[in-house]
Amino acid sequence: MSCLDIIADYGLRSIGLGERLLPRSDFTLCHQFTLIGSGMIWNIYFGTLALTSGFILATLLALGKASKKLYLRKLSGWFIFIFRGSPLFIQFFFAYFLFLSLKQSFTFLSPLTSAWAGALFVLFCNTAAYSGEIFYGALQAIPKSDLEAADAYGMSGFSRFRRIVWPTMLRLAWPAYTNEAIFLFHATTLVFFSSFPAWQQRGDALY
């Protein structure tokens, strides 16, 4: 069997396409790299979706924590505190058993007991909390002269946020935010050691 045949048979195995049984003999380097690459499909799925959706929530959390309204500051602060103050691995276990309990009363929540939705939700909340704190720090570090210049030009509200505050916040937060993005992709491997059942995981364990 050539390496191209191995890739065709096992390249998409992690998402349920191709050969289901692992090879029992002649386990070559091509087999190993193909199976590792197949598993990375899920890492890319979790990392990309959690990062893009978490970015939006992180921006809202940063704005909420910097808001003059007390309830927004408290809600944002507690959300960030809970997800930054507890280990991600514990969050996976807690969320899984919480979703199992809720599924009995709310059947539409049943997808959250699977890794593709439930683990993604946990990663989404976790990266949003960490990124939200990073963005909040960047908001506090925006030079007052930039805001005064925006006021001098007559900018206010959303216009000032879109043209001055948001770009400056991203520029200041970018180094720390890229570190968080790298950490998130590393953390996606924890999904397969958590309680959330993933495709092929049970079959491989029996095999």
Features from the language model and the residues they span:
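Transmembrane alpha-helices and adjacent helix-loop boundaries
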Residues: 1-207
